[in-house]
Design a protein with these regions (language model features):
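Extracytoplasmic/secreted cell-surface and envelope-processing proteins
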Residues: 58, 83-86, 110-119
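Phosphate-binding glycine-rich loops and adjacent basic patches that engage nucleotide phosphates
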Residues: 21-29, 45-55, 160-171
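Serine-esterase "nucleophile elbow" of acetyl-processing enzymes
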Residues: 28-81, 87, 92-95
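Proline-aspartate-enriched helix->loop->beta-strand connector
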Residues: 98-100
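Hydrophobic membrane-insertion alpha-helices, especially the h-region
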Residues: 5-27
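N-terminal hydrophobic targeting signals that begin at the initiator methionine
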Residues: 1-3
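Secreted/periplasmic serine-hydrolase-like ester/acetyl group-modifying domain
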Residues: 119-171
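Short beta-strand segments
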Residues: 104-105
Length: 171
């Protein structure tokens, strides 16, 4: 009976910690443009999905492509998108919809440098809905980074700026 009480106390403490971390995550992690992009590509059907870096974000316009080709598209390019990020975004898209084409804009600079840890490290992963791609992305990329990045994804954001936004998060 004594061991049972210890187990129950441990479960309660873990549940409280998980709830607290989830609440802090919801309150302090800023809403990013990536959230909108990931939501768009998993919720809507597009003929073409464009992945890549900041060059693709500024230089490839899906609306112009649609005018010329008649095919719908969405641009998920963003600065700091490494090959591994694009791969798992493509995997997520393939799980959720079946685009006719995935266009990948390549910046060779991202293949000769290591992905830096920091608040940009979770930019993509944090916005993925629960899926097989998210679990694989975690084990192949995110699990190798600093544990604070996984448990406290908001730790690198300026709290002075974000605290003023907390009220807006819940209204």
């Amino acid at each position: 009976m004594h061991n049972f009480k210890k187990i129950i106390k441990t479960i309660v403490v873990v549940a409280v910690c998980v709830t607290l971390l989830a609440g802090l995550d919801m309150a302090l992690y800023p809403c990013t443009f990536m959230r909108n992009d990931i939501h768009a590509v998993v919720s809507n059907q597009y003929d073409d999905i464009i992945l890549g870096t900041s060059h693709g974000m500024t230089d490839i316009d899906p609306a112009v492509m649609e005018e010329i080709t008649g095919r719908s598209g969405h641009n998920v390019c963003v600065g700091g998108e490494y090959g591994i990020d694009a791969y798992y975004i493509a995997r997520l898209i393939a799980e959720k919809q079946k685009p006719a084409r995935i266009i990948y804009e390549i910046d060779p600079g991202y293949f000769v440098s290591e992905k830096e840890e920091g608040n940009n490290y979770l930019l993509f992963y944090h916005e993925f809905p629960f899926s097989k791609a998210k679990v694989e992305y975690f084990w192949n990329s995110i699990a190798k980074c600093n544990f604070r990045t996984v448990l406290f994804p908001w730790y690198e954001y300026s709290l002075g700026y974000e605290l003023s936004k907390v009220k807006e998060t819940f209204t």
